């Protein structure tokens, strides 16, 4: 046990050091080119390399790869992997100096930081054309995409939001009527639960409790974040393994009681395509859901470095992001790429959703997961 605790402490220190260094840590590694190439020179060298290998947590990479191949004549070998599979594969390959991906699109920021960035397996690269375009907060590590999960309700009986405060989700009238993807099935859901135990969000939850009930929250756990998680789960929370299935369960018409869930905002498109009744709630106190990034980074032992840089740049343009931009709830870190009609920009969601803090997640998620596993129903 002591050895395990020592290893955890050392890993946490590594991550903290990477954070303290910020862009100064990643930029020198990413800048190991002989010289800064013009766009024409980059294209020529990339075409000479002839191919690029990418691991991605999103299957839509295949559509972008096909268009990139047509445009530049560079072959793309794209593999679609689950979060954990990608992290383990890159750890094994780069750690063992085995040739694999040239760059990756990855999520689950706490694990990515602790297992891939801190050991130096991933390298931050920002295309020169994007330095003045992408907001600084999305540059290190470079965000490719932002995805949101929002409280969404069955709107057949009412068009008005069914809750205004997250503590309502712990009240008896909603027992057994709320659905959420099992945090064991997806790291970003575990990340959300972890983030609301942070000092900032625990304080906001405590304030929201007082606003709802006009009294101070009496704690039976570490803080208001843990308290909300406990009461949320103990209120008959229905855990699923698919946001698609959850959206169908919530949105199906003809239900005797109104239901709601916390799932990906992009599923609201099913309102029309699957004849469902789904509406988001965007003004819930103190949060209406959460938002998380997918990072795009080069591997430390990338072979086709110029082709990787060219493809990364392409994916950050409106043309390259097209496979993702066709739906609501998918946002490029490049704010010049238009959002879907009826959607809101990232700036709207940023003030309403819980973001990820990779360092806090890396240091605290295990404790929150253990807490959730021990909740008694």
Q: What do these predicted ranges mean?
A:
Residues 1-49:
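Short, low-complexity disordered leader/linker segments with a strong preference
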Residues 24-28, 32-35, 352-377:
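Conserved C-terminal helix/tail region of periplasmic/extracytoplasmic solute-binding proteins
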Residues 36-51, 55-75, 269-272, 326:
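Short, polar/charged alpha-helical segment
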Residues 49-52, 74-75, 99-102, 174-178, ...:
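Loop/turn elements at helix/coil->beta-strand transitions in domains of secreted/extracellular proteins
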Residues 55-66, 77-91, 99-251:
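Extracytoplasmic ligand-binding site segments that recognize negatively charged/polar headgroups
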Residues 110-115, 256-279:
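A ligand-binding cleft/hinge motif common to bilobed small-molecule-binding domains
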Residues 133, 146-149, 228-232, 274-300:
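Periplasmic-binding protein-like
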Residues 289-357:
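Mature extracytoplasmic/periplasmic domains
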């Amino acid at each position: 046990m002591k050895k395990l605790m020592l290893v955890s402490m050392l890993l946490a220190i590594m991550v903290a050091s990477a954070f303290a260094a910020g862009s100064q840590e990643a930029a020198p590694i990413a800048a190991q080119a002989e010289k800064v190439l013009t766009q024409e020179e980059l294209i020529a060298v990339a075409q000479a390399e002839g191919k690029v290998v990418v691991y991605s947590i999103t299957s839509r990479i295949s559509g972008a790869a096909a268009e990139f191949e047509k445009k530049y004549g560079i072959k793309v070998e794209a593999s679609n992997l689950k979060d954990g599979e990608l992290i383990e594969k890159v750890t094994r390959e780069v750690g063992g100096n085995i040739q694999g991906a040239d760059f990756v699109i990855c999520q689950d920021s706490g694990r990515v930081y602790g297992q891939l960035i801190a050991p130096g397996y991933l390298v931050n690269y920002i295309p020169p054309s994007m330095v003045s375009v992408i907001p600084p907060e999305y540059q290190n590590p470079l965000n490719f995409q932002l995805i949101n999960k929002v409280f969404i309700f069955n709107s057949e009986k009412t068009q008005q939001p069914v809750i205004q405060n997250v503590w309502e989700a712990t009240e008896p009238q909603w027992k057994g009527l709320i659905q959420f993807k099992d945090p064991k099935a997806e790291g970003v859901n575990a990340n959300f639960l972890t983030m609301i135990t942070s000092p900032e969000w625990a304080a906001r939850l405590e304030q929201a409790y007082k606003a709802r009930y006009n009294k101070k929250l009496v704690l039976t756990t570490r803080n208001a974040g843990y308290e909300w998680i406990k009461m949320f789960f103990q209120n008959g929370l229905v855990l699923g393994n698919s946001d698609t299935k959850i959206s169908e369960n919530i949105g199906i018409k003809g239900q005797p009681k109104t239901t709601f869930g916390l799932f990906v905002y992009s599923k609201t498109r099913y309102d029309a395509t699957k004849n469902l009744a789904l509406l988001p709630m965007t003004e819930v106190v103190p949060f209406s859901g959460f938002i998380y990034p997918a990072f795009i980074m080069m591997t430390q032992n990338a072979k086709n470095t110029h082709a990787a840089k060219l493809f990364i740049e392409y994916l950050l343009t409106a043309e390259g992001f097209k496979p993702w931009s066709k739906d609501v709830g998918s946002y490029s870190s490049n704010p010049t790429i238009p959002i879907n009609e009826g959607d809101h920009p990232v700036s709207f969601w940023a003030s309403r959703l819980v973001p990820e803090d990779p360092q806090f997640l890396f240091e605290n998620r295990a404790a929150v997961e253990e807490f959730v596993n021990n909740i008694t129903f």
